[in-house]
Amino acid sequence: MTRGLIFDLDQTLVDSSVALEARRRRDWNSVYSFIPQFKVYDGVKDALFMARSKGLRIAIVSSAPRSYVVKVLSYHNIPYDVIVGYHDASAPKPSSEPMLQALRLMALNPCEVISFGDKACDMISSRSAGVEFVACLWDHQANADRYQMRCASKVLNDSTSLKDCISRV
């Protein structure tokens, strides 16, 4: 039985591509200034609030610093229970450590959780932690990883399909 969901943040829940160059430079002050321009993908908030209403725990596992994740989630009113940022695990994705840390914080077993992400590193991290993985390929940047995502348990090509996917768990 599914009791929790783990999500990547950037290009999975929000389109943060406007800040991509600043992120590459690790210029977090510039990145923060772009947060109001980030767009939550269509249907994402509805899906997350529905998950909450079903009693599912929600974790965000990101390769970005926790402070950034908190700012994005707060600004865009995205619900969550647990955050695992770049510095919160002993090794970053694609290591299993961020996923295992999220599982510990949610007090759930891998078989009770489904993970959602847009990159191969999300899939590798999830699968190596024993967590089912759903590929979220609605962003144009995800196309680079499309071939590698063939090992995902499910592939979603449109963000509005997220709610339907979660409603079935």
Residue ranges and their predicted role:
Residues 1-40:
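Active-site neighborhood of HAD-like aspartate-dependent phosphohydrolases
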Residues 12, 19, 66-67, 121:
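Conserved Rossmann-like nucleotide-cofactor binding loop
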Residues 32-60, 70, 74, 96:
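Short, acidic loop-to-helix structural element flanking the phosphoryl-transfer center
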Residues 54-56, 106-112, 169:
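Glycine-rich phosphate-binding loop signature in dinucleotide/nucleotide-binding domains
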Residues 62-64:
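Conserved phosphate-coupling serine/threonine residues in phosphotransfer and NTP-handling enzymes
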Residues 78-93:
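A short, structured active-site edge motif that brings together acidic residues
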Residues 96-123:
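Conserved Lys-Pro-Asp/Glu-containing loop-to-beta segment of HAD-superfamily phosphomonoesterases
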Residues 115-157:
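Acidic, Mg2+-coordinating phosphoryl-transfer loop and its flanking beta/alpha structural elements
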